[in-house]
Amino acid sequence: MVTNLLGVFGFLTVILRAVILCAQTFAVGGVIFLLLIAHDPTLRSDSWVRPASRVIRWSALTLAFAHVFFVIVNSLVLTSSIDLSMREVMGANFVIAGTLGAAAGCALFFWPGGLRGPANYFTLIPAALMIAATVLTSHAASRMDDRVVLVAMTTLHYLATAAWLGGLPCLLLVMKNVTDLDVLARVSSRFSRLAQFSVLLLLGAGIVMSIYYVGSWNAVYGTAYGVMVTTKVIFFLCLIVLGSANYFLVRAMGTRSNDRDTKISLIRFAEAEIGIGLTVILTAASLTSQPPGVDLTQDRVTLHEIAVRFEPRMPRFESPSLDSLSPSSKEMRRKAKLAGRKLPPAFVPGGSMLHINTPGDIAWSEYNHTWAGVAVLLMGLLALL
């Protein structure tokens, strides 16, 4: 079982990190929304506070379970791949962070009154602990240099993301369940101002972290980390466009007779923002699986190599022959066991790899990606119908 876990460990940690970031964003963002946007009792009604509290509480519980699984998976991999006992692993930073995050998530889920009562600023305590737990397992906490600056920027980044993207589900619930246009205008206006401030924080923190983590222009296109940061920036710009449209709609609300049409437009834009926001968060989770570009000073991809790779050519639609593919790691371990040999459970730098990718392996990867691209293209075309 543990051997199979090693094979999917990288993918599994990215998935768990994505769940943690998404759940944290909605839980903390919901708390911020209740305390900063809707603290006035005249803006609160059971029609939207009840479902909003459910979103916050279940996000917090999801966060708790994700932290528990994250600790279990990492602990099993560590004890099976290197000579560490479970007792020694229990003192690792990721265990402390996971325990802290799980406790904070459970505290918010079991909060007295289910968050439906008056604004309670003590809920900021578990919200802050959630952010702290995630920061402890980020790139910032593992850096040897400039750790204080990077931890501060990462914290601001998470807080701003939660305040903006995490508050959108609550705003959506207000717009769908409240009929009083005056209340809608006040809530939307307050959230718009908070979103603008959050965007400034995100932009500032993002620029600082990019300088420290990417380091140079050739790392932007020459490393996987730089390319993924660029992807995040593109999605961020898409969110800015949608947010700008929302800003002008909010300003118009209450000044013309078709406010109900404005409300519908706000709902549609908010739904689109949530979807793109989730994509940005998933991209951020993928970044944690990559070393920062500034650390990869060797073997960076050049512009010439990129141009050659992107030169138009017919895609591969046929699978390579099975004989040209490398044997599976599971099959290699089975044969090694029958031969009385023991293969390393994990790759050790400087050691030998189980196998090196052959031209057949590369062709197989291209074949899979080609058909995956066809599927995505068809889905996009169908969405336009």
Short names for language-model regions:
Residues 1-351, 360-363:
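Polytopic transmembrane helical bundles with strong interfacial aromatic enrichment
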Residues 21, 357-380:
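The feature marks the first
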